[in-house]
């Protein structure tokens, strides 16, 4: 495995260079702006390329050392792409609504996840002893919890890295990451504050094609990290004095 390749042409075709209308910009984005055309800011892709490459390396390195990456994107055009890419790379996601305290109050979130598991147990069984109305209420509760927490139910703790689409919309998530010292990789459009992000990637955060490209590249970087982790485990096993029983390796890059 290797880090995913991408080209300037791919970025252009996906519309990564199109920012917002010039009057909507955040002046802190000035270093990343190439110019403007028809009152639309044009993002400098010559800076996007190395910063995106750096972010992909960070994702791969995090996963290679056993870390967890949380994909966050709740806007309509990002929601499905965020979930699909996280599942494909055996990572975690929030794609419906960021609940306040999702990271900073993990204990309460863990209790809700336990409730979700319990509801699964009840409803996947015979669910005897419940009236039709009671069962319907349980199904609605499970559906609500699964929508909010389904993407993090198996995370087992706070993540080691967060990947975020739309830093303005997901400001609460970024604030919580900062409080806990969780590094953030994020797309920064012309109306964003780059100072909030550890690993900024200048680019359009609204176009579906651009979001699809980011999600695909981040997912493939995570899959590369899984391959590196498994390869390192294999080397460690081979270096052992006594040859252990060979463990069954689970393919972490398969699609969920």
Swiss-Prot record:
Q: Which InterPro entries match?
A: Ribosomal_uS2, Ribosomal_uS2_bac/mit/plastid, Ribosomal_uS2_CS, Ribosomal_uS2_flav_dom_sf
Gene3D superfamilies documented for this protein: Glucose-6-phosphate isomerase like protein, domain 1 (3.40.50.10490), Helix hairpin bin (1.10.287.610)
Source species, domain of life: Bacteria
**Per UniProt, what is one GO molecular function of this protein?**
structural constituent of ribosome
What's in the keyword line of the UniProt record? Ribonucleoprotein, Ribosomal protein
* One GO cellular component, as annotated: cytosolic small ribosomal subunit
- SUPFAM superfamilies per the record? Ribosomal protein S2
Output one GO BP term: translation
Residues passing through the membrane, by range:
none
Pfam families given in the database record: Ribosomal_S2 (PF00318)
The UniProt entry's sequence similarity note says:
Belongs to the universal ribosomal protein uS2 family.
Name of the protein described by the UniProt record: Small ribosomal subunit protein uS2
Gene name linked to the record: rpsB
């Amino acid at each position: 495995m290797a880090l995913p390749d991408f080209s300037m042409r791919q970025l252009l075709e996906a519309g990564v260079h199109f920012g917002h209308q010039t009057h909507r910009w955040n002046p802190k984005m000035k270093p990343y702006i190439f110019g403007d055309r028809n009152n639309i800011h044009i993002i400098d892709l010559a800076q996007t390329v190395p910063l995106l490459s750096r972010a992909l390396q960070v994702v791969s390195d995090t996963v290679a050392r056993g870390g967890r990456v949380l994909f966050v994107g709740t806007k309509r055009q990002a929601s499905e792409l965020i979930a699909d890419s996280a599942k494909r790379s055996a990572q975690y996601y929030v794609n419906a609504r960021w609940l306040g305290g999702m990271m900073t109050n993990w204990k309460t979130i863990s209790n809700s996840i336990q409730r979700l598991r319990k509801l699964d147990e009840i409803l996947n069984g015979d669910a005897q002893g419940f009236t039709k109305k009671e069962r319907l209420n349980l199904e609605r509760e499970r559906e609500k919890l699964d929508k909010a927490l389904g993407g993090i139910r198996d995370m087992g703790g706070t993540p080691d890295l967060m990947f975020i689409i739309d830093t303005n919309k997901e400001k609460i998530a970024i604030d919580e990451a900062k409080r806990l010292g969780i590094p953030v990789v994020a797309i920064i459009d012309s109306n964003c504050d780059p100072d909030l992000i550890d690993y900024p990637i200048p680019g359009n955060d609204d176009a579906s094609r651009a979001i699809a490209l980011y999600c695909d590249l981040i997912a493939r970087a995570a899959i590369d990290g899984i391959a590196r982790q498994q390869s390192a485990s294999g080397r460690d096993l081979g270096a052992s004095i006594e040859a252990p029983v060979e463990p069954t390796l689970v393919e972490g890059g398969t699609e969920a």
